[in-house]
Amino acid sequence: MCIRDRDHTVPVFLKISPNLGYEQIDDVLDIVSTQKVDGLIATNTTITRDGLSATDHQIKQIGNGGLSGLPLKDRALEVVSYIRSKDQKIPIIGVGGICEPQHAIDMLQAGANLVQVYSGLIYSGPSLVKKINKAILSSSLN
């Protein structure tokens, strides 16, 4: 938090793993409330391979590393919703599995203040951002 001590204009957000359990998320929320963290980014990539259609052999061939994209969506929504149920004020950037406009709306409805896309851009291209913005503007969130 050295940068926060030097310059209070730089927002600091903590990115958390979708692999955390609810007790661990509670611990993170306790720490965030005392350490001048401005918000949370929920979630990072996952190390689990649950719910994939690939065979065990294919998964072993792919190797280790963080999994992102659509397989992360449901857990990311759960984490965002859980955080919002525990803290109504903390800013949350919802990340994970946002591959189409409805996914962004779902993330906002779960309690995120902002959404971040990355894998969705790879599969849908940069027009995804425009589509998300249009969907939000025409939704009940606006």
Regions found by a protein language model. Name each.
Residues 1-3:
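Short, small-residue-biased leader/transition segments that mark boundaries at the very start
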Residues 6-18, 83-94:
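Short beta-strand/loop segments at the ligand-binding rim of alpha/beta enzyme cores
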Residues 18-22, 46-49:
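Short, catalytically relevant binding-site loops at active-site mouths
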Residues 20-34, 85-87, 98-115:
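Catalytic cores of alpha/beta
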Residues 39-47, 97-98, 104-131:
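Glycine-rich phosphate-binding active-site loops on the catalytic face of alpha/beta enzymes
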Residues 73, 130, 134-142:
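Extended, intrinsically disordered, low-complexity segments
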